[in-house]
Amino acid sequence: MSRQPKLERFNNLVKSKYQVYNSLFMTLPFHGITDTGVLLPLFDRICTRGYDKHYNPEKIVNYFFDKYQRDVSEEERYDLLFRFIQYIERQVVLFDAIEDAAYRTVNNMDGRGTLRNIKEEAEAQSKTEELKAYLQDFKIRPVLTAHPTQFYPGAVLGIINDLSKAINENNVEMIKKLLSQLGKTPFFKKEKPTPYDEAVSLIWYLENVFYKASSHIYNYVRQNVFKGEAFDNEVIDLGFWPGGDRDGNPFVTTEITLKVAARLRNTIIKNYYRDIRSLRRRITFVGTEEPLADLEKRLYESIFLPGDEVTVSLEELETTLLRIRKIVVERHESLFLEEIDDILNKVKMFGYHFAVLDIRQDSRVHMHVMEEIVKQCAKDNLGIFPDNYLELSEEEQIKVLQDVKGSVDPSTLQDDIARKTLESIYAMQDIQKQNGERSCNRY
């Protein structure tokens, strides 16, 4: 049987399933769901026709109520419109879950542009060495940016994940329960999310999507392109803005930046802990049990015990895994070696930082900040800058800054923006001490 075109696969596996499960969603015994599901297509049709005729929104909405809901009060009108929004939000989630479940079938995962295709083309054209040379320098940086309107709350993300799994397994009973959960789960909190809340929501993607996907790509390159040869390039370098993006966001404070960095470190250690636990089920050989158990214990302590200090350094984690790897190769026929290599590759890619926390600030702010710092240094007689620094030309100021040495206490600065900007510089140093140099090295 020939493979269906992509559009047909999409229609069969996404569109048709959406129609079936949306019908199931309409039958759930919740207040107003059935009425909302019946009236929404009518409202959609009237909106489309009204838009084509260049009617304004008020005229379109009034026409709908005059035709289908003539006797309802104004409060009931608002209630129905609000239920339309709630219903559509959940339809979008349902569609996302179905699309995620069908992604590997709808899309050709080995087709043109994929890693496998590039590798095979290079081999066919005898250009494998050129591909290796290119990959030694090639790097991408997916950056998760801070846009609170563009992501779901954690509870909804969990439902999408579980719903996709249930759809893949055709588990109708579980799908029905998850749709019921979806109908009862609020999508928005009454309070506006803080920058830290935004960061936590995006860290969910790092923990549940990028962690596995990035390592899968990296493992493929090491195993199938380099095949045991030296390969020191991480290929994927994740970036992260929430908690560090001060450009236009007055709510991002130094405390939040430090808190987000700690959350990133805690999350990656948690992922390592899970992997080590899974590894212990496979690496059960003489000489490996004790060091693995010790790693698991100390990673657990680093996650759950109070305090910011980790009980196992990144270097120690990597060294211990390499020692275990050597034992498995030399004494145990390299059994489950790929699982050890998988964790080692993750440690190389993510360190203790997970993603690079970018500190961002409007460049125009820095002129003002420098002026405030120079004035405060003069007031405190620190002797860091020449007395006439502010009168110097830009070129002369640059020469001074190249040789300037000294330390300024941010708390002495009277200007709020200047103080917070300088605090963010010191915060970068603290983050690098805790999470490693790669954790926060871009301003």
Report residues per predicted region:
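Often metal-dependent polyanion-binding catalytic scaffolds in large enzymes
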Residues: 1-399, 414-420, 439-442
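Extended, compositionally biased accessory segments flanking or bridging domains
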Residues: 403-404
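C-terminal amphipathic alpha-helical interaction region
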Residues: 408-430, 435-443
